[in-house]
């Protein structure tokens, strides 16, 4: 009997799998440990394949979104394309099930953006598709912060010759941050929120608003003093630029 009670208490004391996965992803993001991110992502893939849980499938797709972006930044295009194909297929399933529809359309818009990186010759086609998916996200969720963040990304990274504008990206990032902070639970150990704040800081720097950029970086370090990307790269680089100026 004691063994049964002990086992039941152990089960009750454990976090849910989704909570555990998200906590590990968040910690990997803070520490800049993409090896741990990938390891957790692969565990999520195996669990999602067995359980067919649509909530877990959405969380996995979001984690893959972050991993693909990292792979592209590291010029690991084959790995990026492999995971992107999986994520795109999962996004279709999520739409069919009606799970987190505005967020899913936001991710689809980002996936088309990744396609531009992989197939630059088709940039006009994928760029249009990205904007269409983002418009659908905003139509279905006008207060969805991730939709506004991705709208900011589209404007920020689209070449000026095709109508992109870093200046126009700033208010979209600002609105995304505001909506994250107005939405209950959306800032609690959420790597996407931190990423959005970092994107806003970078956009401020790129549009000659250094004072605002500095405030964003300080805010990030107040929230998470051990956020490696900001602590070791973004903020020190910002301070060096300011000392030269």
List each model region and its residues:
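Flexible helix-coil transition and linker loops at the boundaries of alpha-helical arrays
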Residues: 45-59, 90-104, 135-144, 177-190
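Single-residue signature of alpha-solenoid repeat helices
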Residues: 37-40, 80, 87, 130, ...
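N-terminal leader/linker segments that initiate helical-solenoid repeat arrays
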Residues: 17-74
């Amino acid at each position: 009997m004691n063994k049964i009670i002990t086992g039941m208490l152990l089960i009750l004391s454990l976090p849910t799998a989704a909570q555990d996965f998200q906590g590990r992803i968040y910690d990997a993001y803070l520490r800049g440990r993409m090896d741990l991110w990938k390891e957790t992502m692969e565990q999520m893939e195996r669990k999602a394949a067995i359980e067919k849980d649509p909530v877990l499938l959405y969380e996995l797709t979001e984690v893959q979104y972050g991993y693909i972006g990292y792979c592209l930044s590291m010029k690991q295009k084959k790995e990026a394309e492999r995971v992107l194909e999986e994520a795109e297929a999962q996004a279709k399933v999520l739409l069919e099930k009606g799970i987190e529809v505005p967020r899913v359309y936001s991710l689809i818009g980002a996936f088309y953006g990744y396609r531009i990186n992989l197939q630059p010759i088709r940039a006009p086609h994928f760029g249009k598709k990205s904007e269409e998916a983002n418009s659908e996200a905003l139509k279905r969720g006008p207060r969805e912060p991730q939709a506004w963040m991705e709208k900011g990304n589209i404007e920020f990274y689209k070449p000026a010759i095709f109508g992109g504008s870093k200046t126009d990206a700033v208010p979209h990032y600002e609105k995304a941050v505001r909506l994250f902070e107005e939405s209950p639970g959306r800032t609690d150990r959420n790597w996407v929120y931190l990423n959005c704040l970092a994107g806003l800081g970078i956009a401020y720097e790129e549009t000659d608003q250094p004072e605002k950029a500095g405030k964003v970086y300080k805010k990030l370090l107040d929230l998470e003093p051990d956020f490696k990307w900001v602590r070791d790269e973004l903020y020190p680089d910002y301070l060096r630029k300011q000392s030269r100026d």
